[in-house]
């Protein structure tokens, strides 16, 4: 399989330099970048007036939660979870998760996400959906034991079942992570088991961390230390840990995270919508912490549009700190691409020869994206997910001219509507 994308503005390399060039993709890698390439290809895409960008990496989400979109808004996190989300989740069966994951991944493809990190339950169904639709995903089962030994055994069994299932797929696009939910829902015994198993298998870990004031207070009261201090004492924190949120971190905790080379995933829309707080982005970046970007689940966002997430991240920190230079367009663009790839040890998030061909084409032939001048600025501050025209994952075209080629979009929309009408 080969693809030639011609006549586009290319966001090139780690520095995000804009060049006018063609891109030749062979198998699943970017093979050649240059002007007026004459190579023959199975697919030729004319990108005149368009921008060729690395695909976005959504480093924290819960894809099947699109089923809960609009279920409950404008309330606190704990009320939202206890009174709305958890009661509906108890009704969700495997078939619901499968169709929810198809809708979530469909939305991601149509808004330019090529890789995502997911945590939920019945994750074998998510893996099936991902394999079918053609995205790249890192999937985890959200483990919660609340200190109960019997529950812990069940969670361990579910996690190992998912690991075995994903390995049986032998897919280059579907990978397993360990997913202990959070320090306040997982016992030290479970967290220690995860750490040991991650070391043994070489698999990565994703976890929620210090999303709200309340959970930090709970940990302090129970253990006499902060969440990061607790995890560090357990030997949990290493460079294979991807921690979502990191809103309520002390300076000491930031220092520990930097020392352990942990990635923090910023979820500005969710943090703002649930009134959770504002992460200390400036301090994290100054300390050298790798900060990636995520949407969180659609129930608390309420979409999976990484372009919108970049804009929110950029604007939030400017107004919160009264510093217009903070979270500039290039910084948040890298959070949505290169930093996510770094967290996942993935040869993607950048357009250069030899990188994985996870590439999107953004249509700039639109009033809100003209004149074509500062392209990164336009993507962050002016564009939206609907401007993504073509999505390529692992060297395969999964969306061309806004048409998703791998599945029947209308069928997914109809099926999910029927499911949700019955569930609610």
Curated annotation (Swiss-Prot):
Binds 1 zinc ion per subunit. Catalyzes the deamination of 5-methylthioadenosine and S-adenosyl-L-homocysteine into 5-methylthioinosine and S-inosyl-L-homocysteine, respectively. Is also able to deaminate adenosine. This is 5-methylthioadenosine/S-adenosylhomocysteine deaminase. It comes from Thermococcus sibiricus (strain DSM 12597 / MM 739). The keyword Transmembrane helix does not apply. CDD domains: ATZ_TRZ_like (cd01298). Its EC number is 3.5.4.28, 3.5.4.31. The gene is mtaD. One of its GO terms (molecular function) is 5'-methylthioadenosine deaminase activity.
């Amino acid at each position: 399989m080969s693809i030639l994308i011609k006549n586009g503005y290319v966001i090139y390399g780690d520095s995000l330099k804009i060049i006018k060039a063609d891109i030749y993709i062979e198998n699943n890698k970017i093979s050649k970048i240059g002007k007026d390439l004459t190579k023959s290809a199975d697919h030729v895409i004319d990108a005149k007036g368009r921008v060729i960008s690395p695909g976005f990496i959504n480093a924290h989400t819960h894809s099947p939660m699109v089923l809960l979109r609009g279920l409950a808004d404008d309330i606190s996190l704990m009320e939202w979870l206890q009174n709305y989300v958890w009661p509906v989740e108890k009704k969700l069966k495997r078939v619901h998760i499968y169709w929810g994951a198809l809708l979530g991944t469909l939305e991601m493809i149509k808004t330019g996400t090529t890789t995502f990190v997911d945590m939920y339950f019945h994750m074998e169904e998510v893996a099936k959906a991902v394999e079918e639709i053609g995205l790249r995903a890192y999937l985890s089962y959200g483990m919660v034991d609340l200190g109960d030994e019997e529950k812990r055994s069940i969670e361990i069994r579910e996690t190992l079942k998912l690991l075995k299932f994903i390995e049986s797929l032998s897919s280059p696009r579907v990978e397993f992570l360990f997913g202990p939910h959070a320090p306040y829902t997982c016992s030290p015994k479970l967290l220690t088991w995860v750490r040991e198993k991650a070391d043994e298998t070489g698999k990565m870990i994703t976890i929620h961390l210090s999303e709200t004031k309340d959970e930090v207070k709970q940990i302090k009261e129970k253990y006499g230390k902060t969440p990061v201090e607790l995890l560090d004492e357990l030997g949990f924190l290493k460079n294979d840990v991807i921690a979502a949120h990191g809103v309520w971190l002390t300076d000491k905790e930031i220092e520990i995270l930097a020392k352990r080379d942990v990635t923090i995933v910023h979820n500005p829309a969710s943090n703002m919508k649930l009134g959770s707080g504002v992460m200390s982005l400036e301090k994290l970046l100054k300390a050298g912490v790798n900060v990636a970007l995520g949407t969180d689940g659609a129930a608390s966002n309420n979409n999976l549009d990484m372009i919108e997430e970049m804009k929110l991240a950029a604007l939030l920190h400017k107004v919160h700190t009264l510093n217009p230079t903070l979270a500039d367009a290039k910084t948040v663009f890298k959070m949505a691409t290169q930093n996510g790839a770094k967290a996942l040890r993935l040869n993607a998030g950048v357009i250069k020869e030899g990188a994985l061909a996870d590439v999107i084409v953004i249509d700039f032939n639109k009033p809100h994206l003209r004149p074509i001048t500062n392209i990164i600025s336009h993507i962050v501050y002016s564009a939206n997910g609907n401007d993504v025209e073509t999505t390529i994952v692992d060297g395969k075209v999964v969306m061309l001219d806004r048409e998703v080629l791998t599945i029947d979009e209308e069928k997914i929309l109809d099926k999910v509507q029927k499911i949700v009408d019955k569930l609610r």
